[in-house]
A protein has these predicted regions:
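PLP-dependent amino-acid enzyme catalytic core
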Residues: 1-284
Length: 284
């Protein structure tokens, strides 16, 4: 097993991203509460682990209960598709994305719930069971490409533009900002839930937060939202990546304040973390 590598990431932006303020995220939270399938997922205390580590408490947010999708991804996709339909009613309700994990299934599920269709592109090496899970959703198509994840993202974006469809991708880049930001705002519903649940357990605020990262939309959303809530009392936040696809780590390591990609065809045990390019709008 490789040793764990840790690097300190300085905040290089003078101002917090305004789209992640509690006020600007509130519409996403309210939308989720309006869904008939919505309920907060459990925040599970781990007292034995806390005793072993010598800390007051350890909590884990169990997203396996979210919308029956076994992942938090539905939070971002439902809100982004809802907003896309509301703001662009003239567009054909077909939603396109690239996925190497749960994101594509969540897009297909959300599109079907809202009366649309989904076209999902998957990188080479995608597990057949993941392809089948998407095909099982009404009005959803899944196609495996001979490309890595980052190449599949660009292919899906181009496909959506050529056909007049809507790309629902959490990877943001120049010229594609609004949808990824809606997705990131959707993820903050989980953070808001967790903070309220901690208080019910008698913990007023977290001292440390651990989040995983692929392109960094989820990690950036959690971090940005907490930064707005706590200001100078922001908890210590640790972002955990798979070593073959550690694009955030590499970006910090380069030290120039810019996002940097992992090239080639990285492979990770958890498919959803096999992402080589940071989301421009949640970096750093």
């Amino acid at each position: 097993m490789e040793p764990i590598k840790i690097i300190q990431g300085p905040q290089t932006k003078k101002n917090l991203p305004n789209f992640l303020s509690p006020a600007n995220c509130r519409p996403a939270h309210e939308y989720h509460r309006s869904l008939d399938v919505y309920q907060p997922t459990p925040l599970v205390p781990l007292p034995a682990l806390a005793r072993r580590l010598g800390v007051k408490a350890v909590y884990i947010k169990d997203e396996s209960y979210r919308f029956g999708l076994n992942a938090f991804k539905g939070l971002g996709c439902t809100y982004a598709i809802h907003q896309s339909l509301a703001q662009h009613p003239e567009k054909t309700p077909v939603f396109v994305t690239a996925t190497d994990g749960n994101h594509g299934r969540a897009v297909a599920w959300a599109a079907a719930r809202l009366g649309g269709k989904a076209k999902i592109f998957m990188p080479k090496g995608s597990q057949p069971c993941r392809v089948e899970a998407i095909h099982a959703i009404e009005n959803a198509e899944a196609t495996v490409l001979d490309m890595n994840y980052d190449q599949a993202v660009l292919y899906a974006f181009d496909y959506a533009n050529r056909h007049g469809y809507t790309a629902i991708q959490d990877t943001g880049f120049e010229g594609y900002e609004q949808v990824p930001n809606w997705i990131t705002q959707g993820y903050t519903t989980m953070t808001k839930e967790a903070l309220a649940q901690m208080q019910q357990y008698g913990t007023q605020r977290p001292s440390h937060v651990f989040v995983q990262a692929g392109v960094g939309s989820f990690a950036g959303g959690v971090t940005g939202y907490l930064a707005h809530v706590y200001g100078e009392k922001l908890p210590h936040i640790t972002i955990v990546e798979a070593s073959p696809a550690a694009c955030l780590y590499r970006s910090i390591e380069c030290g120039d304040g810019a996002p940097h990609s992992i090239t080639g065809d990285p492979e990770t045990i958890m498919a959803g973390l096999n992402c080589g390019t940071p989301n421009l709008f949640t970096w750093p």
